[in-house]
């Protein structure tokens, strides 16, 4: 396991001969570790501290071509789990079954599906959509200002005309 142990007592972690807690690693080292994985695991504890996390590891592992198994963290389940991109498991038996399923997936079709999904959710695409929304709001505001200014002129002209008609 790579990464810090936080919000859980290290003594509560499972201890087995094939489980190694390596702590945090420099980002430059991570691809070397990832290259040796058959399946990427996201075994987050499910508690109030993890209820609203959105692990960036999920798209990173998917982009690296690894099948992923995660506990049912809300931002992993939706969209990755519901989209069939990540296997979701919460019990030891579910994790074993999910890992076996991940190992038996057709790698080529999984990668095609993942690539298509990630292309729709890239930072460039997200920023482009945000910029469009901002521009739409600004354009609406400009149109509204023009309309209000035009209405103001119309009201002023009507007031002037009314003064002439009524003699006020």
Language-model segments: residues:
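Short, hydrophobic beta-strand segments that form beta-sheet elements in well-ordered domains
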Residues: 1-6, 68-71
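Nucleotide-activated donor-binding/catalytic signature segment of Leloir-type glycosyltransferases, i.e.
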Residues: 3, 8-34
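Nucleotide-sugar-dependent
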Residues: 26-33, 40-63, 69-81
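CheY-like receiver
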Residues: 33, 98-101, 129, 133
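Conserved acidic donor-binding segment of nucleotide-sugar-dependent glycosyltransferases
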Residues: 85-93, 100-106
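A charged, aromatic-enriched C-terminal amphipathic alpha-helix characteristic of glycosyltransferases
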Residues: 107-137, 142-143
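Non-catalytic N-terminal targeting/anchoring module and adjacent flexible stem/linker
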Residues: 131-168
